Amino acid sequence: MKRYLLAYLIIICLGFYPEQVVAAKSTSNSSKILTQNISDSLTAIANTVIFSDRINQVKIDVNQALKTIKITAGDNFGHLPFRKDNVDRIYSALYSILEKTYPNYIIKAEVYGRDIRELIPNYLSNKIDSSRIYKNTSPTIPLITRLSTPFSVTNGLQNRHVALWNSHGRHFSQLEGKWIWQRPRLFTTAEDLLTTSFVLPFLAPMLENAGANIFIPRERDVQTNEVIVDNDDKTTSRYRETHRRYHWQKGDTGFSNKNEYYVYPENPFKMGTYRQIKTTINDDDISTAEWVPDIPEKGLYAVYVAYQTTENSTEDARYTVHHLGGATEFLVNQTMFGGSWLYLGHFLFDTGINNDCKVTLSNLSKDKNRILTADAIKFGGGMGNIAVLQDKRQIDKSFTDNANTSNFPRFAEGAKYWLQWAGVPDSIYSRNSNTNEYSDDFQSRGFWVNYLSGGSVVNPKAEGLKVPIDLAFAFHTDAGISGNDSIVGTLGICTVNNNGNNNGNSNGNTANTLYKNGVSRWAARDMVDLIQTQIVDDLKQTWHPEWTRRGIWNKSYSEARVPEVPTMLLELLSHQNFEDMKYALDPRFRFTVSRAIYKGILKHLAYTNNFEYVVQPLPVKEFSCKFISDDSIRLTWQETIDSLEITAKPDSFIVYTRINDGGFDNGKIISGNSYVLEIESGKIYSFKVSAVNKGGESFPSEILSAYKHPQNKETVLIVNGFDRISGPENFNLITLAGFMTDRDAGVPYLYDISFTGNQYVFSPDSAYYDNENPGFGASKSDYENMVIAGNTFDYTYLHGESIKEAQYSFTSTSVQSVISGEINLQDYKAIDLILGKQKQTFSGKLKNKPEFQTFPLALQHKLTDYCNNGGNILVSGAYVASDMYDYSKEDNDNFVSSLLKVKPLDKDTIIFSGVLYESQYSNFLKKSRHFEYYHEPNTNMYSVEKPDLLESTDEDAFEICRYEGNDYAAGVAYKGVYKACTLGFPFETIKDGKTRNLIMSDILSFFFNSKP
């Protein structure tokens, strides 16, 4: 009986099992097909918007009872910038794939536990999520009010406070026992310096020009000198006080610069005292404090003030910075940011102790009996003074004899070291109790943001400096290599969940996705989306039509996770990818990127705070300066239209004036595009112009100068034809590629702080091993602690000094004003054309023609007409002949050879730094004189890697100087119907001022005194 029963059970099993297996396999295969199709569709849609890896881990969660389907996928799905159109396409694809299997089901696609429709940014959505609108509604008085600015920002970033930092910096590695960069030297730079070259010259000034108060957890002044003036310290600098009704009194703990260097956890803001006094509303009762620095070297110095915040601090401490351009006033709200270094601006100071170069503080206020405090004032950036110990037992004071500093400018160091110097608690800058300085550095930045905002309306329960920070922005570049000459591109990162998870799920704790003020941390994703979109869109329209957008990551990065304000971590491009770096090294690209970030921040804050934004204008163009009488000058300029931003139209302009070698004044507002002013003879006047509107101020124009000789001598017109700024020359031969900085290092904007040294590994097949052996792109370190001079756009003054010494008058103009006809060359008997390192330069993939040509066709016509009418012309530049010369032609029938009577010789020769100045012609020096020009990177003047070697093309042309050690001509003069003098190196790069004066005097004597 049992056997029959067993057989029966076996039969039943055999009868039914195969059918069940088939059904299970069928269901499994069907599910795989569906998930595969969904993965294919999502990946295809994603790659129309961003560069995306395959979207895998698709899950189909079916609820048969409710007839709903929830679709989720891996992290890549969340990287999309969701928009109504791509969300509609996603849902359309999902319904198309699933409707046959699951008819009439409602589908919901989710990322991080949220419907993707909810992740359309608020500023693009019809359904606003008010929980993620982060705004400061408190009418806070801004930390700094600039009283001397001749215009007001009403539709920009006024009253906004932004925390900003430029990635990594020099830090001490306990593992290696030395100071190192956090990233390798690649393609002539390191990320630690590369991001700084965006933030300091471009992004920070743009934000401040829009009215924002900017906070950077690193030194922002590239001036390597530093002077501290303090009430506690007796130095050659002076601190003084005056008293009237109220007297200055000793305060509590404050700053004192007691040590040559500081070790962990020393705090210089706990080593001294501060001063305090009551405020007054009466002009007759004013008391003052005065800080007079002993400046070691004339130059631009950042001014930082220190004070303490007390219970009844004043909201309008009146600081006046006296500098070589005049006096600039500020109001500082001392109810916040006490006990640290507050940056006011950069100013020109003279060498030594000068009563015209100082800072004063007055107790005059709108409110009486508030408390005004005064502590140290810092001039300049200086060198790093935070020391470390090579032994891990560095907290033990017995080891302080082994302390060493970085020996680098402070701006090159990481945040950790600046924060210690700036009085920030060691619990902020050293989260690892000084046992891991690498981690301390990157972790400190986010906690510093919270320290800034602690006690303010945005972070009310925390201890801190009470600054109502609106947002934070971390500027990085990334690693990674992309083949086929493609761009790695731009990545945006936020962290929605502050518990350290790599997703937006709150694990049941909604507090994990809220800031301290109760606003949803999803606000950060909206901000990241907007700024990343602005960057990529602008780059596609100006530099590369296929610039890569990588996506929006919601991952746990300390810099994005820790701050209690919306924070973006930007990975702009890959510093390891040659194609990306061809753009990154170009100052114009840096300007475009920085302007895009500024616009993104502006638009984000405009949306969240419900105001109409206006973008600051672009710099003016076609600037000219000419005499209209013996004692008056007319300046003219034209606005620049911004094709990317309709609101960036100027309302008015500001003219800044400098007299002789002083500094620029605070500017005069001008409604039109011209300005007439009276001048005194015997003084050199210099001018620059900026455009302004309700959103802020543009970057300044080039600088033009003019001088009227007291005896009303002939006037020389200086034409500035040197407006080039560019990255270094590059090449790509498939098997070899890179940057040829020894041939043409490019031209920095004002200065360069990113150059470490020449590239020495050119093989793309050379692999990364470690930071000291990074493979393809590896570069030297010769110049990594140098601030390298670039194009200051101020060479009309330098040329003008020599013309003045030769006893002639001069005025100046941009070359564009000559081409446009605003300036008529025929009005002048002699012109001095500055070409510097002007050279045809290709950039980007949207520009079919080169920029910065030495002699564009329209200029050729103007110069030819001028010379044919008996004019006299001096031209100097590193590419004065070679830029226009077509080596494929055997004849000399081109503009340079026919007008200037020179042709270039092969540049691929040895570098010459010395010039022998001598000539047999009576108007030029017969006795030999040796001089040098700048041919290597330096701090004083842009350098010329390869000057032009000249050869005369006319029997009436003759050599006036030659490169030392050979017979190549460095300068050629011509005397015929007109007179011409051509120098194969820029005149302004001659190192010795007396030599410049001598050569200019000889040339002008040749022009004006010799017979035709």
List PLM regions with ranges.
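Active-site microenvironments of hydrolase-like enzyme catalytic domains
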Residues: Q394-F399, A412-R525, W553-Q576
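Short beta-strand-plus-loop segments that form exposed binding edges in beta-rich domains
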Residues: V359-I371
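Active-site-adjacent mobile loop/cap segments within catalytic or ligand-binding domains
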Residues: C357, L364, A376-G384, L471, ...
